[in-house]
């Protein structure tokens, strides 16, 4: 087992990474607050891992809520169901919420924990690659709104993250590839050596070769933990974690939540960010080619869907958390391994990037 620490003073917590962790009862037990546990999971994950988790929680008063699966269910209405179940039991403010699932479950369960009785403890047990390397770490919790993705939420840190790599054995190929998009992101924004490693070993990660998979998860989590420790609430450097996300969120919202997986949209968004970075003179054609080649080898989209026309794309991008005083800011690449947040681009260059990306 590997442990990565997220250093946030009194709110610091560990990320546990390894095989068979769901069966190690003591790992979760030392982070559970109180004697009441609500497990939030979904219809896909529950038949696979809920019983295993509950076997380790026999000393607690447990309940579970099983939600429908998919980004389209990450809504205020479904969040209400979590609150309803917490209140019907009822659970006190000395309970612990456990999120068992991918990014959607983690985001919603975390947001519910942040709000319920003004905040209760929660634990992340991510079961997808994307959740293990990104969404479970850092305390971002949210639901979507029809006008924008993740626009209603809170920063609220978990007590721990338990990333059992065995859960990736049941992850379908599309979800695995989508998770690899967020792994690639870390190499692009701040870790060129990792990017180079991925160019050589992405096929091993996709083949679920254990040592490659664990290395990719650990390296990703260490990168994110360092960024979160430096800027928990995204007032500075943490914003670089959004490489590809402004474009990607526009794709997700424009197509309808769930049509593309989050990682697929981010992959297309990173390709667009690389293109705009080249137009600004920051990346060479060769460097952009390296980005596109890795995305292609990962089986990820490199273009935006033609269903979203340019005017609509720009309209959707304007509903973004990085917009300040009506000014759109984007995460772009000064070079491979170095990202910046900037509004220093002309609208005609942005429109040219959108035109080129749309297929």
UniProtKB/Swiss-Prot annotation:
Transmembrane segments: none annotated. CDD domains: DHQS. Disulfide bonds: none annotated. GO terms for biological process: amino acid biosynthetic process; aromatic amino acid family biosynthetic process; chorismate biosynthetic process. NAD(+) binds at residues 69-74, 103-107, 127-128, 140, 149, 167-170. Pathway: Metabolic intermediate biosynthesis; chorismate biosynthesis; chorismate from D-erythrose 4-phosphate and phosphoenolpyruvate: step 2/7. HAMAP family: DHQ_synthase. Belongs to the sugar phosphate cyclases superfamily. Dehydroquinate synthase family. PANTHER family: 3-DEHYDROQUINATE SYNTHASE, 3-DEHYDROQUINATE SYNTHASE, CHLOROPLASTIC. This is 3-dehydroquinate synthase. It comes from Nitrosococcus oceani (strain ATCC 19707 / BCRC 17464 / JCM 30415 / NCIMB 11848 / C-107).
């Amino acid at each position: 087992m590997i442990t990565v620490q997220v250093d946030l003073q009194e709110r610091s917590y560990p990320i546990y990474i390894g095989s068979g962790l769901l069966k190690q009862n003591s790992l979760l037990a030392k982070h559970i607050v109180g004697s009441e546990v609500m497990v939030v999971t979904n219809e896909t994950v529950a038949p696979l891992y809920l019983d295993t988790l509950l076997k380790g929680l026999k000393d607690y008063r447990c309940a579970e809520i099983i939600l429908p699966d998919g980004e389209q269910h990450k809504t205020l209405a479904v969040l209400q169901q979590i609150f309803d179940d917490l209140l019907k039991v009822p659970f006190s403010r000395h309970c612990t919420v456990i999120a068992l699932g991918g990014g959607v479950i983690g985001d919603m369960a975390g947001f519910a924990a942040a709000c319920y009785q003004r905040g209760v403890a929660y634990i992340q047990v991510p079961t997808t690659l994307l959740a293990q390397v990104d969404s479970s770490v850092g305390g971002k919790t949210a639901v979507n709104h029809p006008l924008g993705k993740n626009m209603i939420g809170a920063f609220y840190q978990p007590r721990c993250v338990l990333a059992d790599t065995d859960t990736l054995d049941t992850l379908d190929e599309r979800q695995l590839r989508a998770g690899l998009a967020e792994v690639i992101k870390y190499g692009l924004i701040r870790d060129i050596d990792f990017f180079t490693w991925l160019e050589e070993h992405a096929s091993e990660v996709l083949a679920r070769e254990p040592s490659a998979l664990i290395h990719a998860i650990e390296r990703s989590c260490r990168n994110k933990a360092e960024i979160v420790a430096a800027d928990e609430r995204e007032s500075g450097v943490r914003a670089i974690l959004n490489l590809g996300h402004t474009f990607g969120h526009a794709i997700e919202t424009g197509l309808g939540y769930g049509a593309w997986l989050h990682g697929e949209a981010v992959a297309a968004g990173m390709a667009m960010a690389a293109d705009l970075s080249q137009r600004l003179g920051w990346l060479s054609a060769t460097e952009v080619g390296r980005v596109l080649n890795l995305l292609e080898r990962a089986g990820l989209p490199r273009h935006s869907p033609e269903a979203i026309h340019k005017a609509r794309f720009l309209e959707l991008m304007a509903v973004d958390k990085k917009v300040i005083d009506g000014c759109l800011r984007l995460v772009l690449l000064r070079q491979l391994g170095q990202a910046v947040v900037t509004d220093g681009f002309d609208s005609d260059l942005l429109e040219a990037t959108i035109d080129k990306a749309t297929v």
